[in-house]
């Protein structure tokens, strides 16, 4: 009987152990979730950041991680102290460090969406750091496939990253800059954003400003170069014509001074009228050159205005730019 009771007890003990072990496993699996949830309870976003969070249409998981990394909008000096580690003048819009997110507080109305996009970008860094190696590996092929198809958008400089960093950057950039992703990737990002396309809209909203500006500058430069060539050709044509005309006028005047050089009044008048006609035609060439020069100067002025505008935008997004008092 004793043996039977002991056996029963062992069965009971074994069962209890199994239950306990399952409980430990469950806690282990959810520890990060619980930790993020608890940390997030202490998050007190500003009104602006709260609006940004709402605009991203985060899922429960996305909102939990967002709150846990406590994104903050930072002004220039404080942002540079936290996010800029060198004297590089490269524009840095945000950073994820020590499981916190910091976003450069860019308020330019022309660049609407840039803070939302940056917040989403840095959030995905936090998400990626929470992913298990196996989950990352499952996405590797898809991320590389999308990159191959979108190098013009994502930039070939990504190839300069080391493999691990490259995959993380692809994960973050593709999730915030590319629409119409493979279904498996879309489903993955849907765990964070209810509408990943909406996040990409924020990216396109501000990046379009720079792309339009770049296109405008290229178009203006083409017009400037074409006019420059036309002015050069027309100027040479005018100078050659003026040289020949002046020579012929001098010959005509010398002939007019010489008795019997012109055989008749008709010949005199005919040659004189021909010179006057040529002079008028050359004057039209001169006016045409002036018109080209006016157009050229107009395009140059417009080009310079756009350059200044572009520099101002770059200063706006670049926290390393030193603002000097005028």
What are the residue ranges of the model-derived segments?
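N-terminal Lys/Arg-rich, disordered targeting/topogenic segments
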Residues: 1-8
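Metalloprotease/metallohydrolase-associated module, dominated by Zn2+-dependent proteases
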Residues: 2, 14-29, 44-98, 139-242
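Alpha-helical transmembrane signal-anchor/signal-peptide segments
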Residues: 34-48
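Short pre-active-site segment immediately N-terminal to the catalytic Zn-binding motif
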Residues: 102-119
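Active-site recognition of the HExxH zinc-binding catalytic motif
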Residues: 117-130
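Extended alpha-helical coiled-coil "stalk/arm" regions
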Residues: 234-269
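C-terminal amphipathic alpha-helix
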Residues: 278-326
